[in-house]
């Protein structure tokens, strides 16, 4: 049996886990090579009792090693985060804080500054001002007069200061390790997190709680399958949640299986619009639908980052609680990767594709002549609201150079506030999101303080800026069939068609003018559309070619980059999930793996697709952002 870690730098016996509050007296040896008697306390910030106005950000934990707290105040100071700690003894300690100066690559003036408080007293050292990369920064010496201590994080700017952990030590030269391997070993040793995780047994485990994963879990549960749904955010919906605020798109209830999509209609929001107020996205509606299913167990705030495999099958997925660091193992005969990033498939060694394939690879007319790493980007959306009296916004000195010519005199950043195209969507997620933030702040600060027509914006208040990026593309797991532009545009129907994809082939590219003005780092995009007739996605695109018990739904299915342009829409992903949940039922009833469902039991799956699992009696509310197809052009002719 092989154990695959989510980070290549982590050894098998060092799964990346988070710590709560630890006191250690005694001998400890870790990867820095230091072996000494230490008297130390380590505090992981995401485990703070009170988060105040700080948010847990897990988007880059597979790269930098940890969730962390983020002071995302959009220019307004956020309330302190705090926790209570028991020290092993009184005395003088050295303090180290793991943090980074997030805008250092763009300015020598830091944006996200904060202080550490001890029993209500703020220590003078300011953090978030030094290293561009995550590192331990010395906070000097602190005196602990009481064993019971309150530790707090105090925001100084409201502009996304961030803190991973705080370390107190009495020993000389006891600087904690900064590499992921050393940090993992330190945390595991201090908390005993290398102990065997709690075991859970299910028929079907779905990882990823976006529309695709949520529909997959509900679909299977309604068909009698015992399901676990693992989601690494506090809400369901993914890009359609109030954290990202992208509205649903594409069509449902299409031939050859018009009942597919009733589930999307049942749990999806009734209003459209990107970057709208929170209630538009109806997070509670999705949550209530999941909680109503007796066969479905939901694990919010759990990040799957380790698996076990045997004989090209996943045996278990291990996920950690983002706040407590507790690990749980999920055993099942069948899994679904609905993470978007293809995380579970990647950990299992599944074949995958990324970037753009060359034209010769699939003979796609829209593909580039040469393969490259260009992908569609991440959107950091935002909007303002008009208020009755003038409202200030800081005239930031750390933003990008701006001018009237560079500015966008608007009050909302929609899908086309998109960046990161050409970057690594996994390894550079934090950079991409941060660049999305700095351009929003730079533009808004300029409009409020220096724009020629700034009077137009004096009563505009920056209401919301996403700190969770809306991602479109990263890994695509390879199935027994790779769907391409050719089948879709030529209407080459395959015998295992399932959920129809109806949106245009919608591919995004950097806006050339924006690219030039901002020296090759565009944050605005354009979309090029090719209308299609709806096309049923082959079932063979919904399971892995080489991991025998892994299915997938959403943007990580087996398609070319060009074909992804149509299948990636969330209503389509929801229908994929509905099909994958049905396939899990067929698999359970026949003790069959996904490939065998295609080969031997597809007729059973067809019957389920004809019936659907959603409530067909509900009013149809998914009539916004449906997109145009060639069907309308045919009607006009």
What is the predicted role of each segment?
Residues 213:
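N-terminal Rossmann-fold NAD(P) dinucleotide-binding loop
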């Amino acid at each position: 049996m092989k154990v695959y870690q989510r980070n290549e730098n982590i050894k098998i016996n060092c799964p990346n886990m988070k710590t709560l509050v630890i006191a250690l007296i005694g001998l400890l040896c870790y990867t820095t090579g230091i072996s000494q008697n230490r008297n130390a306390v380590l505090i992981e910030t995401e485990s703070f009792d009170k988060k105040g106005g700080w948010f847990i950000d897990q988007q880059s934990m597979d790269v930098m090693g940890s969730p962390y707290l983020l002071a995302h105040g959009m220019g307004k100071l956020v309330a302190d985060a705090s926790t209570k700690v028991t020290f092993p003894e009184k005395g003088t300690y050295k303090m180290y804080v793991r943090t980074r100066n997030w805008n250092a690559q763009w300015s020598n003036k830091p944006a996200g500054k904060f202080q550490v408080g001890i029993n209500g007293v703020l220590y003078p050292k300011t953090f978030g001002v030094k290293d561009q990369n995550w590192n331990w920064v010395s906070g000097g010496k602190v005196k602990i007069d009481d064993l019971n201590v309150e530790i707090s994080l105090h925001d100084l700017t409201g502009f996304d200061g961030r803190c991973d952990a705080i370390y107190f030590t009495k020993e000389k030269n006891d600087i904690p390790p900064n590499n992921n391997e050393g940090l993992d070993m330190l945390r595991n040793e201090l908390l005993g997190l290398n102990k065997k995780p709690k075991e859970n047994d299910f028929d079907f485990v779905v990882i990823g709680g976006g529309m695709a994963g949520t529909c997959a879990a509900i679909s299977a549960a309604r068909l009698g399958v015992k399901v676990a749904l693992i989601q690494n955010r506090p809400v369901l919906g993914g890009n359609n949640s109030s954290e990202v605020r992208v509205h649903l798109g594409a069509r449902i209830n299409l031939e050859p299986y018009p009942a597919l999509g009733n589930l999307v209609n049942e749990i999806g929001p009734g209003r459209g619009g990107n970057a709208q107020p929170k209630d538009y996205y109806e997070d509670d509606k999705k949550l209530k639908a999941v909680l109503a299913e007796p066969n479905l167990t939901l694990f919010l705030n759990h990040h799957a980052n380790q698996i076990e495999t045997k004989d090209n099958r996943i045996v278990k997925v291990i996920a950690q609680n983002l706040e407590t660091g507790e690990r749980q193992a999920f055993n099942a005969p069948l899994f679904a990767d609905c993470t978007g990033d293809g995380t579970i498939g990647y950990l299992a060694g599944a074949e995958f594709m990324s970037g753009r394939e060359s034209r010769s690879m699939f003979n796609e007319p829209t593909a580039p002549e040469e393969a490259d790493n260009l992908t569609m980007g991440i959107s950091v959306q935002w909007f303002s609201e008009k208020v009755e009296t003038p409202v200030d916004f800081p005239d930031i000195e750390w933003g990008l150079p701006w001018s009237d010519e560079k500015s966008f005199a608007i009050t909302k950043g929609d899908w086309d506030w998109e960046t990161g195209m050409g970057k690594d969507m996994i390894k550079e997620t934090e950079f991409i999101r941060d660049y999305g933030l700095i351009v929003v702040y730079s533009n808004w600060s300029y409009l409020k303080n220096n724009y020629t027509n700034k009077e137009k914006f004096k009563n505009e208040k920056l209401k919301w800026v996403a700190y969770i990026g809306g991602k479109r593309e990263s890994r695509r797991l390879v199935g027994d069939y790779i769907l391409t532009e050719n089948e879709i545009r030529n209407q080459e129907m395959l015998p295992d068609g399932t959920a129809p994809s109806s949106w245009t082939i919608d591919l995004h590219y950097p806006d050339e003018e924006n690219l030039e003005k901002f020296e090759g780092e565009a944050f605005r995009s354009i979309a090029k559309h090719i209308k299609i007739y709806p096309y049923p996605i082959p079932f063979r695109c919904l399971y892995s070619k080489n991991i025998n018990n892994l299915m997938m739904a959403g943007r990580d299915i087996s398609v070319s980059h060009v074909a992804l342009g149509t299948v990636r829409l969330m209503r389509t992903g929801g229908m994929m999930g509905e099909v994958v949940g049905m396939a899990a039922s067929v698999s359970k009833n026949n003790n069959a793996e996904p490939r065998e469902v295609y080969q031997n039991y597809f007729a059973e799956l067809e019957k389920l697709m004809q019936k659907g699992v959603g409530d067909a009696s509900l009013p149809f509310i998914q009539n916004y952002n449906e997109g145009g197809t060639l069907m309308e052009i045919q009607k006009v002719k």
